[in-house]
Amino acid sequence: AAPGSAAPFSTLRPGYELCRNCHADMVDATLAKGRVHWAVADKKGCVNCHGPHAAKHDKLLTKAGAESCRDCHADTMARIAAAPVKHKPVDSGACSACHSPHAANGVHLIDQPSINTLCESCHDYQTHSAHPIGDKAVDPRNKNLRVGCLSCHTAHGGDFKWMLHSATNIELCTRCHKQFAR
């Protein structure tokens, strides 16, 4: 567009293709992952979060830390803000402690083989749990599911101590083990 015109800014190449000219290794590694964040893959590509030439924040981010995430994930951020108990990385605005902002091979853009593995990268399962989890721990509600960290805990924050789904152990256990309900 001509200087001073109302026409939108345009580039020689769309989205991440423009960035690939100089950052081919990073763009190619990102696109090779199993799950690519929509913000990378859409028509604006990298400039959804990064300034093309300069920005006030590290890594040319147009907004600091979690503020970049808030633009598109406002509903999640609102739930987190309302939760009385928050996961420490979430409370500090460090979304990238668990989620990759660009792409990952794991669900929910986590770069771990499973949610349990992600949790165990900071939390010692043997110290923090009395319940088995993993491939051998079958969910009593559905034989096709396995018990994992999120069976009892919320990921970002919640209403109860230790981010549990229920206020008491009895309530928590009887969510799956109905035979123990009073």
Where would I find each of the regions flagged by the language model?
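Short sequence/structural segments immediately N-terminal
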Residues: 1-182
